[in-house]
Regions:
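Non-catalytic interaction-recognition regions
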Residues: 1-243
């Protein structure tokens, strides 16, 4: 009542556990009947539970609710372990390693939570979430870092992105993936389903990886092809960062 009278919202969205769906259905109906706000302006954005390997809602060892700070700490520890496994830790300083670990941990948790259909439950698996392979946040992060490095090296060599032309099936697949961004963004918003956008950026990263494996990019001797592929890389990076 206070929010309606004080804020005068056009729409109110309640992002709460899907198990509360019946409760909100009743609350919204009561609010409509009381003349506070019509039901079509009230929406429950339900989400599934984060479960342990036993299939039950994830909790601390003591049985309490796990706080976000605890999740961040756990993800950071796993990310640091992952970086150590890559052999990267020996090439960078302690401060840079900590910065990269924080980025990896954040990407892992965010993507893991948003990639699922919002109302479904999922198992909390940090080993999988922090992997640099597969459908994970670190995989997308790695693709972005690789593109930035590629564009930077091209710039240092005097090469710039240019007009895009399609000369192969891998390039065609990448262009088609890029073309889906606007629709993915629109559908993700309209349906209140972030996983749609997550699916798009993952597909895009896969398409870029296929291009990277199939063709030279910065080292392409044909100038038109080189500038085209650099242009594709620039477009991919833009969508990965926006997504």
């Amino acid at each position: 009542v206070d929010r309606v009278e004080t804020l005068h919202p056009d729409r109110m969205l309640y992002v709460v556990d899907q198990r509360q769906a019946l409760h909100f259905e009743q609350v919204f109906r009561a609010a409509d009947m009381a003349g506070l706000m019509s039901e079509d302006r009230l929406e429950h954005i339900g989400f599934g539970t984060v479960n342990g390997t036993d299939g039950k809602p994830f909790k601390t060892r003591e049985g309490g609710v796990l706080r976000l700070a605890d999740l961040n700490r756990m993800a950071l520890e796993e990310a640091e372990k992952r970086i150590g496994e890559t052999g990267l830790s020996g090439d960078i300083g302690e401060e840079e390693r900590a910065r990269i670990a924080a980025l990896v941990a954040r990407a892992a948790l965010r993507f893991a939570d948003l990639q699922n259909v919002r109302t479904t439950n999922y198992v909390f698996d940090l080993e999988r979430f922090t992997s640099f392979e597969g459908k994970t946040g670190p995989y997308l992060l790695y693709a972005s870092v690789r593109i930035k490095s590629l564009l930077r090296r091209a710039k240092d060599a005097g090469h710039a992105p240019g007009q895009i032309r399609i000369e192969s099936e891998t390039e065609r697949a990448l262009v088609l993936a890029l073309d889906g961004f606007a629709n993915a963004l629109e559908q993700s918003h309209a349906k209140r389903q972030p996983h749609i956008l997550c699916e798009h950026v993952y597909t895009l990263a896969q398409a870029f990886s296929a291009l990277y494996a199939a063709h030279p990019i910065a080292n392409e001797s044909d100038e038109a092809l080189r500038t085209s592929r650099l242009g594709l890389c620039e477009a991919v990076l833009s969508q990965l960062e926006a997504g």
